[in-house]
A protein has these predicted regions:
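Bacterial Sec-dependent N-terminal signal peptides
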Residues: 1-28
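C-terminal low-complexity, charged extensions that often adopt amphipathic alpha-helices
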Residues: 7-9, 13, 113-122
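Sec-dependent signal peptide cleavage junction
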Residues: 22-51, 55, 155-156
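Short, non-transmembrane alpha-helical segments in secretory-pathway proteins
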Residues: 39-59, 99-120
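Acidic (E/D-rich), amphipathic helical modules within compact regulatory domains
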Residues: 48, 53-96
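Conserved histidines in hydrophobic membrane contexts and catalytic metal-binding motifs
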Residues: 72-75, 131-135, 139
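A short acidic/small-residue loop/turn micro-motif
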Residues: 97-99, 156
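Short, low-complexity, Pro/Ser/Thr/Gly-rich segments in the mature regions of secreted, periplasmic
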Residues: 140, 144-156
């Protein structure tokens, strides 16, 4: 009898977690009106993604855009790669040229400059309320929205 109760409890917990997972999966269903694939035009991605590119990379031509159901990747002529969520919010920027200071909030940028003033930013990744900032000196900084340095590590 005890084993039967354990089995029922396990099945109940499993069904709850399965329901949660399937309900979250529905949040990421493809937009039927969006254009997907390789080489999609700039005009087909969300307006806030277009505005981000124009604001932070105004004189750099868009070379290529790839759009899947779960992200949008934009490649610029200078080698910069920008990754967006399907709603057009940016999630990652990689560059080997000058990263625009305007991408990060001022207090986050101030922490980067104060911590490693000679280093250049080559990658920024937004993870909820934390920014992962990779520098050209092989350091990765973890900074919250308030500009507090949470951690750092050598990226080997």
């Amino acid at each position: 009898m005890k084993n039967f109760k354990k089995l029922l409890t396990s099945l109940f917990i499993f069904s709850i977690f399965s329901g949660i997972l399937f309900s979250q999966a529905n949040q990421y269903t493809p937009d039927p009106n969006a254009q997907y694939g390789y080489g999609v035009p700039l005009s087909s991605i969300p307006q806030n993604a277009q505005d981000f590119i124009r604001q932070h990379f105004p004189n750099i031509e868009v070379s290529y855009i790839e759009r899947d159901w779960d992200d949008i990747e934009v490649y610029l002529a200078n080698g910069t790669q920008i990754e967006f969520f399907p709603n057009g919010d940016w999630k990652e920027v990689k560059t080997y040229t000058n990263m625009p200071d305007s991408i990060l909030p001022q207090n986050v940028m101030a922490t980067v400059k104060r911590t490693y003033p000679q280093a250049a930013i080559i990658k920024i990744e937004k993870q909820f309320t934390i920014f992962e900032v990779k520098l050209n000196n092989m350091m990765e900084l973890y900074i919250d929205n308030n500009g507090t340095l949470i951690g750092q590590k050598f990226d080997d």
